[in-house]
Amino acid sequence: MIYKELKITDLVPELLNDFDRHEKIYRAWRLRDDGSEYLKDIYYEENWDNNELLCICNELKSTFEKGGSVFAAFDESKLVGFASLENEFFGSKKQYIQLSNLHITNSHRHKGIGKTLFNMCIDKARELKANKIYISASSCENAQIFYRCMGCIITKEINKKLYSLEPFDYHMEYIL
């Protein structure tokens, strides 16, 4: 496995050609009005079509243009995972920067790739002198297991803009 920080010239639409985002979701976490959590039986499938792949590529380019970073994992020459960390500080004390993407191709999940990419983002966030990483994470069971095992907790301060985009996501933070 080869891990590296990408350059903007690496971000061509073909980079994501073989990336398989497909995932069957059977359970997802939900919050009750009183703040308690429960695991809800639910079924849906997530996948990216060609239009979404192009949007992701453009989103990653935008991350670069704003001074952010994109990290990738390759199995030989095939992209099998990527993570992006923005470079815009926010929060009441400008303590957060956002982990805007962390995705692993279907065939390579549960092999430690996500952990390595997340740790690369932690190192970069520390280099940038951030105090916390903000994550708008899928509420699906597998994503929550991952982020909680990495030490993420429900955020202390909601980013209203990000929340409005993803109201069913769990808004989390990782304290650096």
Predicted regions and their residues:
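Acetyl-CoA-dependent GNAT
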Residues: 9-11, 18-95, 100, 105, ...
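Conserved GNAT acetyl-CoA-binding A-motif
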Residues: 125-138
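Conserved acetyl-CoA-binding loop-helix of GNAT-fold acetyltransferases
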Residues: 101-104, 110-123, 148-149
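Short beta-strand "wing" residues that participate in macromolecule-binding interfaces
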Residues: 85, 154-155
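C-terminal "cap" of GNAT-fold acetyltransferases
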Residues: 136-140, 144, 148-150, 157-176
